[in-house]
Curated annotation (Swiss-Prot):
It comes from Bradyrhizobium diazoefficiens (strain JCM 10833 / BCRC 13528 / IAM 13628 / NBRC 14792 / USDA 110). This is Uncharacterized RNA methyltransferase bll2648. The active site is at 373 (nucleophile). S-adenosyl-L-methionine binds at residues 253, 280, 300, 347. One of its GO terms (molecular function) is metal ion binding.
Length: 415
């Protein structure tokens, strides 16, 4: 059923929000102040509508730069001018903190998209008539939109989509694929690092075919479910003055500019601390840079990432880095273990670090620097620190996921 709505504002998920009859209606790709024609969405989404036409457009509306926008589900916001978009992203942080009763300075949004995303996951699926499609998930669907170029990717990933198509063809033609095929491609110093997931065991002829593709596309490394198929060169990335060899599938900040921005903000807030603890350290984007001036102790549950950090820590000129695997959700560091550190940095995954935040709140650590990719769980954890006696010295929102609702942030707490 077609209806006409007036959009009040853009919500935290990037959808236009129409208010009326006591409920909110969400319309993707609509902007505040617009009058739009919409249709109901099939399925269990009574509060969502499909945008059919914009009758009265916002003066802030701009033309999307990608021909796949609105069909591909990768980007939610290419239709909004930069200035109001930046203000909206900052407002997500301000409003979420306010809901948690946190009143602090929130700096202007820092754009850290840089030259684009350095990692991408492509999906391989069979469509109608058993035709293979490789690309991104469609908006609000598990369908695959076949794509050969994505303008938000780092130019170093220019060959990623062609390589994914070339790998998907032998994987799907020479053996049955019982699960969706996912192909993660990461840009590294020595070429593309590719991990394939969803395929079954690889018979020798298929390994040969995949190795041929890897050579043709000059992949640095090809793995299947993290197991090595072929490596031409070590897939390394630069972190500070150090080259780190990435374990297959290990966490990596989305953009080079994003990592450098977050690391710089962390270092500024750590200040002159001599003993620093890095929690949820990953492969060491913060630890390796902090070790240029301070001794660092680092923990993460990913043993492969910790091993990569330990190897990189041997780089000449760094102060000692002691690192070991530890599940910080099940075994958070307790106040007695925290007492010798001048500063603690923690950068948990999206679920936040509630258990560790409780222990930090009971500690005497002078400075805590929080990095987060989820404003809601950050607000929860920040509330715990504040209730434990810490003051929050301000928040800096960082946008390395441009054209999406996702926003990262860095905050400093002190006693």
């Amino acid at each position: 059923m077609v209806e006409r709505l007036r959009i009040d504002h853009v919500g935290h998920r990037g959808d236009g929000v129409a208010l009326g009859a006591g409920e909110a209606i969400y319309v993707p790709y609509a902007l505040g102040g617009e009058t739009v024609e919409v249709d109901h969405v099939a399925g269990n989404h009574p509060d969502r509508r499909k945008l059919l036409a914009v009758d009265v457009a916002s003066p802030e509306r701009v033309a999307p730069f990608c021909p796949h926008f609105g069909i591909c589900g990768g980007c939610a916001i290419q239709h909004w001018a930069a200035e109001p978009y930046h203000a909206w992203k900052r407002s997500i942080v301000v409003e979420t903190l306010a809901q948690a009763g946190i009143d602090c300075e929130v700096a202007p949004l820092v754009d850290a998209h840089g030259v684009g995303r350095r990692r991408v996951t492509l999906h391989g699926r069979f469509g109608t008539h058993d035709i293979l499609k490789v690309g991104f998930s469609a908006a609000s669907s598990h369908d695959v939109i076949p794509i050969h170029r994505c303008p938000i990717l780092d130019p170093a990933l220019d060959g990623a989509l062609d390589a994914a198509w070339a790998l998907a063809e032998p994987l799907t033609s020479k053996m049955p694929v019982t699960k969706p095929l996912d192909i993660q491609v990461t840009a590294t110093t020595n070429g593309l690092d590719v991990d394939v997931r969803g395929s079954g065991p690889l018979p020798t002829p298929l390994v040969t075919a995949l190795s041929r593709v890897a050579e043709q596309h000059r992949l640095a490394r090809l793995t299947r479910h993290g197991e090595l198929v072929l490596q031409r060169l070590p897939p390394t990335v630069k972190m500070g003055r150090t080259e780190v060899t990435l374990p297959p599938g290990s966490f990596l900040q989305a953009t080079v500019a994003g990592e450098e921005t977050l690391a710089s903000l962390v270092a500024e807030r750590v200040g002159k601390a001599k003993e620093v603890l890095d929690l949820f350290c990953g492969v060491g984007p913060f630890a390796l840079r902090l070790a240029e001036k301070a001794r660092v102790t680092a923990y993460d549950s990913d043993a492969g990432a910790v091993a990569a950090l330990a190897k990189a820590a041997r780089t000449p000129g760094l102060k000692p880095i002691r690192c070991e695997p530890r599940d910080l959700f099940r075994r958070p560091l307790v106040p007695q273990e925290l007492r010798d550190f001048d500063a603690v940095v923690f950068d948990p995954p999206r679920q936040g670090a509630q258990a560790q935040a409780l222990k930090l709140a009971a500690s005497t650590v002078p400075v805590i620097v929080a990095v987060s990719c989820n404003v809601a769980t950050f607000a929860r954890d920040a509330r715990l620190l504040i209730d434990g006696g810490y003051r929050i010295d301000g928040v800096v929102p960082v946008d390395q996921f441009r054209h999406t609702p996702h926003v990262e942030l860095v905050a400093r707490f002190a006693r």
